[in-house]
A protein has these predicted regions:
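Proteolytic maturation boundary segments
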Residues: 123-171
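M16 family metallopeptidases and their MPP-like homologs
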Residues: 2, 11-121, 136-144
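Short phosphate-engaging motifs
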Residues: 6, 48-49, 149-150
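His/Glu-based metal-binding/catalytic segments typifying zinc-dependent metallopeptidases
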Residues: 1-9, 171
Length: 171
């Protein structure tokens, strides 16, 4: 609903309508070590960093204020199931998935359970998940870019921690 297709909310509003990003994504993360972590991300020009952050936050709030429709949920389910096919379209990809599942302790029938689980998701479950988990007041914001162009955009946030991620020259 937030991303994954050209009609998704983030893509439609932030990329198409506002022109703030070429790449914008979001959803509930499916990381093995942090399952369920909500992530919104975009690539934008330095000078539109502030507007981009505000747009991402606004879209998160809008998922609660204007919850997904039945049509949005069905489209999202279909897109997820259809895209999943490409992650298992070769023997090496299937083997890789099974090895990953084994490593993280998932059952051998996890793939079929996953598919059935997606098919059974209801609009009300999506709405409840948005209400429960998309809380911009709890967001951590990560900006990668030059301080010169992003400092003023970040000044409005309570605590900004600067990290030097410079890659040293090889010696």
């Amino acid at each position: 609903i937030l991303s994954g297709s050209f009609g998704a909310r983030l893509f439609s509003n932030i990329r198409s309508k506002q022109g703030l990003a070429y790449d914008v994504q979001g959803g509930v993360g499916f990381q093995w070590d942090y399952p369920g972590m909500a992530v919104l991300s975009m690539s934008t020009k330095t000078e539109t960093t502030g507007a981009g952050i505000e747009s991402l936050i606004r879209e998160a709030r809008d998922m609660v204020k204007n919850p997904p429709t039945d049509e949005e949920v069905e489209k999202a389910k279909s897109a997820r199931l259809n895209s999943f096919v490409f992650s298992v379209d070769s023997p090496s990809k299937v083997l890789g998935k099974y090895l990953t599942y084994e490593y993280f302790g998932y059952s051998s029938d996890w793939l079929s359970k996953f598919k059935k689980g997606i098919e059974q998701v209801t609009t009300e479950q999506v709405r409840e998940a948005a209400r429960k988990h998309l809380r911009p007041e709890d967001f951590s914001i990560l900006v990668v870019g030059p301080r010169k162009g992003t400092a003023s955009a970040l000044a409005r946030y309570e605590s900004v921690q600067e990290l030097d991620i410079t890659i040293p020259e090889p010696s």
